[in-house]
């Protein structure tokens, strides 16, 4: 056997037994410090929850619900200003989301309805907004969410309203027109679609999902699965449940749905755009009081008079006062042919003087107008 010697320099690391002992000692010392810190954190958390429950009792006497999204936004903003790192602001927000959720759960039994089944994007948005400490009710369709809140079976409902690539969720818009519910919060959720199936990619003949999800993956489907049948169903999670029992069927949904229903993931990140975000609304029976330190967005619906310049006249009260219109969208009213509702979002709250004046003038310029709700601009 020949031995070959290299001229390359050799770097040797010498770790003595003493070094190992010192490192182990330091490790144990750090763990003891963390244990002590955890002990203090738990004491402070219980103290915080006790104070929150005291506030809850005062709210109960006043007939005010413990959930207050505007106040929560103030808390999250203050927390961000307190922290210099290394904890990220998003992580800090997530931690306190659960702390606040646990506090609310001790103050009152609250039920949140959402478009089910479990693991839909709407479910994820609801948990992002309310935390995991509250009770959730999965409902089969968007109208059922509205009905559950209207009947009192749920305290709040979470529904999708628009997507950054596919636009409005028309079912939600239509229901907002006739419902007495009001919007009290908004939630933004980044959407990452995955393909699930019990079959291999080349054996798939049908893809099921929510209609919006199918549209958001149209380019990928056209290239990777040309000619397959695209079948819309009530939700992304329902599609995963169905593909589990049907051979040759695939589903488009979020990663969580595949994990919960135990269906293999074939492809991930199949949405046509990486910046795919869905906006959700939280609806309730009663509006929440305005907080002066909070920036608000307000939603309303209107229909125009049948006259020249009707739309310009309707929007004039906002432009004259420098009120920013965040969104305007038309939708057939379904009351008569070629009659449209216009859904408008603007920056501000009706209790602000200039907004109140604009709304009074708007009422005279329109055939019909109704406020749908005011809510914190920031949102989750």
What are these regions (language model features)?
Residues 10-12:
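Cysteine-centered motifs
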Residues 17-380:
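Domain-level signature for soluble enzymes in the chorismate/prephenate branch of the shikimate pathway
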């Amino acid at each position: 056997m020949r031995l070959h010697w290299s001229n390359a320099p050799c770097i040797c690391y010498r770790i003595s037994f003493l070094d190992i002992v010192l490192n182990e000692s330091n490790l144990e010392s750090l763990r003891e410090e963390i244990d002590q810190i955890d002990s203090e954190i738990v004491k402070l958390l219980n103290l915080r929850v006790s104070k929150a429950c005291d506030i809850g009792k005062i709210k109960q006497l006043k007939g005010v619900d413990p959930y207050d999204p505007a106040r929560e936004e103030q808390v999250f903003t203050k927390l961000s200003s307190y922290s210099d790192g290394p904890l990220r602001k998003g992580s800090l927000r997530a931690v306190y989301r659960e702390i606040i959720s646990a506090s609310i759960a001790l103050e009152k039994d609250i039920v949140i309805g959402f478009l089910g089944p479990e693991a839909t994007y709407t479910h994820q948005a609801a948990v992002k907004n309310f935390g995991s400490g509250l009770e959730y009710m999965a409902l089969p369709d968007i109208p059922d969410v509205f009905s559950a809140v209207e009947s009192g079976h749920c305290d709040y409902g979470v529904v999708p309203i628009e997507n950054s690539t596919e636009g409005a969720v028309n079912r939600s818009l239509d229901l907002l027109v006739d419902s007495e519910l009001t919007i009290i919060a908004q939630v933004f959720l980044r959407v990452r679609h995955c393909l699930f199936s019990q079959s291999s990619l080349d054996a798939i003949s049908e893809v099921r999902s929510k209609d919006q999800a199918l549209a958001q993956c149209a380019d990928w489907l056209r290239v990777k699965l040309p000619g397959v049948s695209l079948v819309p169903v009530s939700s992304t999670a329902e599609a995963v449940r169905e593909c589990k029992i049907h051979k040759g069927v695939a589903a488009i949904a979020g990663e969580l749905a595949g994990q919960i229903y135990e269906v293999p993931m074939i492809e991930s990140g199949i949405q046509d755009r990486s910046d795919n975000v869905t906006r959700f609304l939280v609806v309730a029976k009663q509006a929440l009081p305005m907080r002066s330190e909070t920036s608000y967005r307000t939603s309303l619906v209107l229909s125009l008079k049948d006259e020249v310049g009707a739309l310009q006249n309707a929007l004039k009260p906002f432009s004259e006062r420098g009120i920013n219109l965040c969104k305007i969208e038309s939708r057939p009213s379904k009351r008569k042919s070629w009659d449209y509702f216009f859904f408008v979002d603007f920056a501000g709250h009706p209790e602000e003087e200039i907004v109140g004046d604009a709304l009074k003038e708007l009422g005279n310029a329109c055939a019909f107008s109704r406020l749908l709700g005011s809510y914190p601009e920031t949102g989750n």
